[in-house]
């Protein structure tokens, strides 16, 4: 939740530890408990290749000071309703990490929250859709149940199926969004339907 490595270094914010800093203590403990059930794998992590390694740490600190956003971790998470959906969206599923456009140096444009990103700025060069409630360019015509269905099954209202990174997060490796409780998927849907509608045709 702070991006600090075991040797005290700071990782680049490619790992979204800023949003994760708002995850509830009870959920962090559950996540760690789950990770400790996995079979150990001995595999060294390759060093990130930069021309001057020292600059990587300096750049990370500078970026975080200028643009980083950290949160206070609550003891427990909201249990229901839109507040539950907001918590899951912003600190667990971190939907905005992909669906909010970023600048060339990775700064999220929070005025375009969830409004999608074109292939030139989307993660891994993928087109990321606008999921605000805008009825023309977003998903404002979708019912809450349809949003929940997509999160769990990957199926859109037109019976098409998601692809790319969204498919990956739904399926997961051992677990993914498909394992989400339906009431949590509906809470996320309710929150997404409550955010500002932004007209942004992604291309």
Task: Name each model feature, range by range.
Residues 1, 15-18, 68-72, 130-135, ...:
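Sequence context of c-type cytochrome heme-c attachment sites
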Residues 2-3, 8-19, 25-34:
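Membrane-embedded segments
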Residues 3-10, 38-41, 90-125, 137, ...:
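Periplasmic/extracellular electron-transfer cofactor-ligation site
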Residues 7, 23, 76-81, 90, ...:
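Extracytoplasmic/periplasmic, Sec-exported soluble proteins
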Residues 18-28, 112-156, 169-185:
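Electron-transfer interface patches adjacent to heme c in soluble/periplasmic c-type cytochromes
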Residues 31, 85, 92-102, 147, ...:
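The canonical Cys-X-X-Cys-His
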Residues 43-56:
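Extended, well-folded interaction surfaces typified by the phenylalanyl-tRNA synthetase beta subunit core
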Residues 61-90, 107:
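Electrostatic cytochrome c docking/interface patches
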């Amino acid at each position: 939740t702070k991006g600090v490595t075991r040797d005290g270094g700071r990782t680049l914010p490619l790992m979204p530890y800023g949003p994760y800093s708002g995850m509830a203590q009870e959920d962090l403990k559950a996540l760690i408990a789950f990770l400790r059930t996995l079979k150990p794998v001995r595999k060294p992590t390759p060093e990130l290749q930069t021309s001057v390694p020292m600059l990587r740490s300096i750049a990370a600190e500078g970026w975080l000071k200028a643009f980083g956003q950290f949160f206070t971790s609550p003891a427990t998470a909201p249990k229901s309703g839109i507040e539950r959906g907001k918590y899951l969206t912003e600190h667990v599923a971190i939907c905005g990490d992909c669906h909010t456009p970023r600048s060339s140096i990775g700064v999220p444009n929070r005025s375009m929250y969830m409004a999608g990103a074109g292939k030139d700025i989307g993660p891994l060069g993928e087109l990321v859709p606008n999921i605000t409630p805008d009825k023309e360019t977003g998903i404002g015509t979708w019912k809450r149940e349809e949003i929940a269905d997509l999160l769990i099954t990957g199926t859109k209202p037109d019976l098409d199926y998601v692809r790319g990174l969204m498919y990956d997060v739904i399926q997961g490796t051992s677990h993914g969004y498909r394992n989400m409780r339906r009431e949590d998927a509906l809470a996320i849907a309710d929150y997404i339907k409550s955010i500002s509608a932004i007209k942004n045709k992604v291309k």
